Amino acid sequence: MFPRNAWYVACMPDEVADKPLGRQICGEPMVFYRNAEGAVVALEDFCPHRGAPLSLGFVRDGTLVCGYHGLEMGCQGKATGMPGQRVNGFPSIRSYPVIERYGFVWVWPGDASQADAVKLHHLEWAESSEWAYGGGLYHIRCDYRLMIDNLMDLTHETYVHANSIGQKEIDEAAPKTVAEGDTVRTSRFMENVDAPPFWKMALRGNGLADDVPVDRWQICHFTPPSHVLIEVGVAHAGHGGYHAPADKKASSIVVDFITPETETSIWYFWGMARNFRPDDAALTASIREGQGKIFSEDLEMLERQQQNLLRWPERNLLKLNIDAGGVMSRRVIDRLVAQERAQTGAPRAGAPRAGAPRAEVTRDIPVRTAT
C-alpha cells in the first residue's frame, strides 16, 4: 500500500551511467538509462517483443537496446527499430516522469498527468555551498512503513545504537508530536547530558571540546510519500541548545528517503547534511562512515521484525506515546492512498497488507494537531 502520485528517489545519478539500471519501485519494474542528451529516462522494464527485461540490454547512442533480440526503445516507450523488422505496429510500454535534482534521480510511479516538479520538496541543503552531504543506499527486506516508524521514534537509539548515538536520556525525554496537514513532526530535547560517541566526534570535527555537558535535540519531520528528515545536534550546555550560535554546536540533518520496492522491501537512501566545515572532505567521509555503521545496525532488527509480522499477522501490537510520530505518519499515508483509490475507482483493500497486524491496541498516545 503506497501513494503512487508522488516523487520517490529512484537512484543516485552515478547509478545511471553508460548501462541501464533495473529497479523495482512501488511494485513496478522500471529501467533507467540516459538518452543522447544525457537526461535520465524511465521505462517499464519489459520488452514488448518477448517480455525480456530491458535492463539486461545496453545503451547505444542514447537509445535503449534489448539484450535479447536487439529491439530499440524510444524515450516515450515506443519501439524505434529492430533488425529485420518493421516496428510501427509494436505495442508501447509505459514511460515514467523523471527529475534529476538535489543529487538524486526521482521518479513518479503514478498518474503521469499529475506529475509536477513543483510537488518536489525544496531541499536547501542540497543546493547551498554552505552545506556538505554524504550518504549511501541500503536494500532492506521490510515494509517501508516499518522504516518510517523507526525514524519517527528515536527511542530505539538507546538500545539498537547503544555504542554510537544512544544514551539513557533519550528514554527520559518525552517526545512531542504535532501533525500539520500532511506533515508530522516529533521533537525531543535533552539538556545538560554527556554527548554519545558519534556526537563527540562531530564536536571535535567542528573544533569544539567533546568532554563538556551538552544540550541535544532530535526533530523528526515526515513528509509524504515516505521521506523523513531529522534535525539533530548537540551544543555546549547553557548556550541555547538548538538556537545556540554556530561556534557552540555541531548540528546536521539526517536524510532518509525511503522508496518501497515491494510491500515487504525497500530502497533506503540515507545520509547526513551538515552546515559546519562543509569544505572538509575528510570530515564528510568520516561522518558518512559513522552514519553508515549506525544505519546498518537497524537492518537486522527491521528484517526480523518484518518476518515476525508475516508469521503472526493476527497478533495485536501496542501503540504507546513514543509511537505517535509513526502512527500519525501512517494516518497520512492511509489518507493519501484512500484519496487515490477514490479518484481511480479502485476497490478498497479488504484485508491488511503483508506484514501489517490486523489490530492494534492504543494506549497513552498524546497526539496534537496544529491549527
Predicted segment positions?
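Rieske [2Fe-2S] iron-sulfur-binding domain
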Residues: 2, 7-132, 365-371
